């Protein structure tokens, strides 16, 4: 029983001028983000309004832009845009043409206030109505990249675990779900009864998810090939096998193993081709390893000094050695590098009574900043281009939700909420790229 409890505890423990124009203006401490209005110059049916609504939602789900839309104006020429009443810095002008096969051609122009020329233009052809959301996310990525210089993330995916009947002795249902970044288009890619699915993590090419689970009474680490649904068990060590994550090149995974029926776990790197192990840590409970973007170091959680904190280890050290990230942090769990390797996002408990929030650690200056303000926020995962963080928030009634926050902490969004205590949402993982 002790090993099972320990296993479960590990699961829980666990363009240059254009860009210059868009530098946010700071006024009395408030960042004024450029306002983008999305309008159509024709409304052939409900399709344009549906697409434009998704574009607006996308452009509000970030830290660099804000957006609205309007159906008041059918603008036939760019000279007729009512800039004064719109109060916009930019207009995304969309024109929809429907053909005999009920498919659409969509023309998109980006216009700037006080500029008589189009900044950018693109056309999407032969779009079926079933691809409405995909089209909208494509347009959003295009607009976001042109107006900020950064990659959009609106065609990325989220993987997460949904647990039904979580407190039942039998009949607990675990589902691994993949959805669009905004929670739409959910697909169950793996379903198990009474065998937990935990800590899913994507491969960098987006083809595989690695996760830990119980099967036949023992823990193991598995890979799921997303396209085929093929599941492969890759570890079968006694005791705890948990918290796997892929290396950037996809050739290795980092994971936590007890290698026996012990409460202590250590971090290992496994070569997926040979199954050879390299040990990274030597004492304490060590878990939740994540590779740095360059693959040269691993960040993880350890309680070796009496309470959980974040440690960093080199993957190239001849002998296991690691160092604490910062003595300023009281307790910390579940670290993740940002894609540029400059920050670490983690679950932070700043005092015994503070609860847990999602925090950002700046590696350059050592500052720690909470970016959420809940009492039970956990499981952060960073978007592939570093702008946003998805995480789990649990309220005082024990209801969990999948939420999103910008890395600066200014923008918060809900993605999915479990509206009763009989469902839990756990372990989100953001895909490494757009699909």
UniProtKB/Swiss-Prot annotation:
Residues 1-20 form the signal peptide. Transmembrane segments: none annotated. One of its GO terms (cellular component) is periplasmic space. It is found in: Periplasm. InterPro entries: 6-blade_b-propeller_TolB-like (IPR011042), PD40 (IPR011659), Tol-Pal_TolB (IPR014167). It comes from the Bacteria. Keywords: Cell cycle, Cell division, Periplasm, Signal. Its main location: periplasm. GO terms for biological process: cell division; protein import. HAMAP family: TolB. The Tol-Pal system is composed of five core proteins: the inner membrane proteins TolA, TolQ and TolR, the periplasmic protein TolB and the outer membrane protein Pal. They form a network linking the inner and outer membranes and the peptidoglycan layer. Belongs to the TolB family. Part of the Tol-Pal system, which plays a role in outer membrane invagination during cell division and is important for maintaining outer membrane integrity. This is Tol-Pal system protein TolB. It comes from Francisella tularensis subsp. novicida (strain U112).
């Amino acid at each position: 029983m002790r090993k099972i409890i320990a296993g479960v505890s590990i699961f829980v423990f666990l363009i240059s001028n254009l860009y210059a124009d868009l530098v946010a203006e700071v006024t009395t401490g408030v960042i004024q983000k450029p306002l983008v209005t999305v309008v159509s110059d024709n409304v052939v049916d409900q399709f344009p309004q549906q697409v434009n609504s998704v574009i607006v939602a996308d452009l509000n789900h970030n830290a660099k832009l804000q957006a609205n839309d309007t159906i008041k104006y059918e603008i036939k020429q760019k000279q007729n845009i009512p800039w004064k009443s719109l109060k916009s810095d930019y207009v995304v002008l969309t024109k929809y043409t429907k053909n005999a096969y009920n498919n659409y051609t969509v023309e998109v122009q980006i216009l700037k206030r006080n500029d008589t020329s189009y900044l950018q233009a693109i056309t999407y052809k032969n779009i079926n109505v079933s691809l409405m959301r995909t089209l909208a996310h494509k347009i959003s990525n295009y607009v976001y990249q042109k107006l900020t210089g950064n990659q959009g993330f609106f065609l990325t995916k989220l993987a997460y675990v949904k647990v039904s009947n979580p407190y039942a002795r039998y009949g607990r249902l675990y589902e691994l779900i993949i959805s669009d970044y905004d929670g739409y288009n959910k697909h169950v890619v793996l379903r198990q009864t009474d065998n937990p699915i935990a800590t899913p993590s994507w491969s960098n090419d987006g083809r595989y998810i690695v996760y830990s689970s119980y099967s036949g009474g023992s823990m193991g680490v598995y890979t799921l090939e997303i396209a085929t649904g093929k599941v492969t068990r890759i570890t079968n060590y006694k005791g705890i096998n948990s918290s796997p994550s892929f290396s950037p090149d996809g050739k290795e995974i980092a994971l936590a193993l007890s290698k026996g029926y012990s409460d202590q776990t250590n971090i290992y790197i496994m070569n997926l081709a040979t199954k050879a192990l390299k040990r990274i840590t030597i004492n304490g409970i060590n878990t939740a390893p994540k590779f740095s973007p360059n693959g040269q170091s691993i960040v993880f959680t350890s309680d070796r000094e009496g309470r959980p904190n974040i440690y960093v280890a080199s993957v190239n050290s001849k002998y296991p050695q690691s160092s604490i990230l910062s003595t300023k942090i009281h307790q910390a769990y579940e670290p993740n590098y940002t894609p540029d390797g400059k920050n670490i996002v983690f679950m932070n408990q700043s005092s015994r009574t503070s609860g847990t929030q999602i925090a950002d650690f700046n590696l350059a200056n050592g500052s720690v900043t909470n970016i959420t303000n809940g009492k039970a926020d956990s499981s952060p995962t960073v978007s592939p281009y570093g702008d946003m963080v998805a995480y789990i928030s649990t309220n005082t009634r024990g209801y969990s939700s999948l939420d999103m926050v910008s890395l600066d902490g200014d923008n918060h969004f809900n993605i999915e909420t479990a509206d009763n205590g009989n469902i839990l949402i756990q372990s989100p993982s953001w895909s490494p790229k757009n699909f």
